[in-house]
Amino acid sequence: MYNYLDFEKPVADLEGQILELKKLAQEQGSVEMGDEISRLEKRSADALKDIYRKLTPWQKAQIARHPDRPHCLEYIDRLFTEFTPLAGDRKFANDEALQAGFGRFNGTPVAIIGQEKGSDTKTRLKHNFGSARPEGYRKAVRIMEMADRFQLPLITFVDTAGAYPGVSAEERGQAEAIARSTAECLKLRVPVISIIIGEGGSGGAIAIAVANRVYMLEHSIYSVISPEGAASILWHDSTRAKDAASNMRITAQDLFDLKIIDGIIPEPLGGAHRGKESVIDATGDIIAASLRSMKDIDGETLKQERRQKFLEIGRNI
């Protein structure tokens, strides 16, 4: 069974009944329950469609954070061959929250950077829940510089609530590391494609998302601050995150309307976790199309178009 979100309770109840009936039918060797199971399956599918047809921004935020959602390493494993990760920032340490390296996409050598949240307690702690430290962003800069030197397209996967805000990170220059990574993105003379696959939070996200083409999964979110953080600032009450989300325009649909992103990648009904392979493959199709569209554009033009793109965002919102 799936991990159900609170607003999915009607579906959870129905799918629980379906599983019980299937188990009972198997134990009794009965085929008489087939009609009842089919009826409940239709009710469950209809309920899921009804819920996902009218999702609120806060509900989309919860889907973006779903623990079973496909994460960066799953995209890398399925979309790229010969992936070779690089470790360390040549200054302090390696940061497992930020994955980076080189591989082949449909046979083409590319550079890859992404934030990894982890999928269970052990890996979440290992990857610091996707919140990168300064050494993570400095590692990203290493990869960007190498991509530019060897003229390799850069593909990034964004999935973070934000950069790690701890004292140790601040002592090691978190703000400088984020700023430098953002600036490095703007200097690259290669195609840069960024996919927001879950949460895109604050400077921790934008540091690897200043791209020629930016796409979001259908139920991902992208904002300068989390709904909880905004609620704490505006109303001194983080429990009003739902109200904040409704006013922040954090959804893929809002950001496409604002011309901040270039497109939306559809998710299976019920979210990406209900069809991981299909949504990863759809992401691969978008990456392939984007690379084709930039194949004949020279490096200086790519750089200037990217800079202009983000200047326009600042002027228009």
Curated annotation (Swiss-Prot):
Which Gene3D superfamilies does this entry report, sorted A to Z? 2-enoyl-CoA Hydratase, Chain A, domain 1
Pathway connected to this protein: Lipid metabolism; malonyl-CoA biosynthesis; malonyl-CoA from acetyl-CoA: step 1/1
Q: Does the keyword Lipid biosynthesis apply?
A: yes
Specify the enzyme's EC class, one word.
transferase
Predominant subcellular localization, coarse grouping: cytoplasm
EC numbers listed for it are 2.1.3.15
Q: Which PROSITE patterns match?
A: COA_CT_CTER
- A GO CC term attached to the entry: acetyl-CoA carboxylase complex
Give its localization. Cytoplasm
The cross-references to InterPro entries, in alphabetical order and at most eight, read: Acetyl_CoA_COase_a_su, ClpP/crotonase-like_dom_sf, COA_CT_C
Which GO terms of type biological process are on file? fatty acid biosynthetic process; malonyl-CoA biosynthetic process
Q: Which Pfam families match?
A: ACCA (PF03255)
Subunit organization: Acetyl-CoA carboxylase is a heterohexamer composed of biotin carboxyl carrier protein (AccB), biotin carboxylase (AccC) and two subunits each of ACCase subunit alpha (AccA) and ACCase subunit beta (AccD).
What the protein does comes down to: Component of the acetyl coenzyme A carboxylase (ACC) complex. First, biotin carboxylase catalyzes the carboxylation of biotin on its carrier protein (BCCP) and then the CO(2) group is transferred by the carboxyltransferase to acetyl-CoA to form malonyl-CoA.
Name of the protein in question: Acetyl-coenzyme A carboxylase carboxyl transferase subunit alpha
**What is the scientific name of the source organism?**
Brucella ovis (strain ATCC 25840 / 63/290 / NCTC 10512)
Q: What is the lineage of its organism?
A: Bacteria, Pseudomonadati, Pseudomonadota, Alphaproteobacteria, Hyphomicrobiales
